[in-house]
Regions:
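A generic structural signal for short, non-catalytic loop/turn and secondary-structure boundary residues
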Residues: 1, 60, 176-179
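Coupling/switch segment of ABC-type P-loop NTPase heads
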Residues: 1-54
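Switch/communication elements of ASCE P-loop NTPase nucleotide-binding domains
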Residues: 36-39, 43-46, 52, 66-183
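Short secondary-structure junctions
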Residues: 50-64
Length: 183
């Protein structure tokens, strides 16, 4: 999967073949402020929410700063920026941990695809075991009234599998935390 840097320019027409390396996911996120502002909010929620990945980062796109008339003054363009919750420092994806940029295309796809198939190899690549557990929740935590994507996952992560099995057991035993959806 690619890691966009400061020179990344989103394709205004993301293509199907760009999903294999994550390019189309970054394109969609960069362009989401113009077309689907809910997407960037959902992805940012996955990164910042304590009950999800809890990475202490929010995500913004250059379009959110309302500087379309003269973005060159601040050096911002339609790109994705990570912002640490406890500071105002804006970072490009290549300036944060590799694991965050590797998991972002999966989170983006999970919030775009409905009634489709998302195939991914090693979603656990370069991420901490605690984040791997949250990825297990990403695969299972959808409201029942939402058209869910089907995930085809090739993984070596015991953490992801154990989280999914835990959610299945909690659903079966009626012990699922209130904030979670049944599996």
């Amino acid at each position: 999967r690619i890691i966009p840097d400061s020179s990344f320019t989103p394709n205004p027409y993301p293509e199907q073949n760009g999903w294999f390396d994550g390019t189309s996911a970054w394109d969609k996120l960069c362009l989401s402020q113009q077309n689907d502002s809910a997407l960037i909010k959902k992805v940012s929620d996955w990164f910042s929410n304590r009950d999800k990945l809890n990475t202490n980062y929010n995500i913004f796109s250059g379009g959110e700063f309302d500087i379309k008339t003269s973005p060159q003054l601040l050096g911002l363009k339609d790109n994705v920026y990570f912002c640490k919750i406890d500071s105002s420092q804006m970072l490009f994806p290549n300036q944060v941990g590799v694991g965050l940029t590797q998991i972002a295309p999966l989170i983006i796809a999970a919030n775009i695809v409905q009634d489709g198939l998302i195939a991914i190899e090693q979603p656990e690549l370069h991420i901490h075991p605690a984040l791997q557990l949250a990825v297990g929740d990403l695969f299972t935590q959808y409201p029942l009234d939402v058209k869910r994507p089907m995930f085809l996952v090739e993984t070596h992560s015991e953490h992801i599998l154990l989280r999914i099995l835990k959610r299945i057991r909690q659903t079966t035993d009626n012990e699922l935390p209130e904030s979670n959806y049944p599996v």
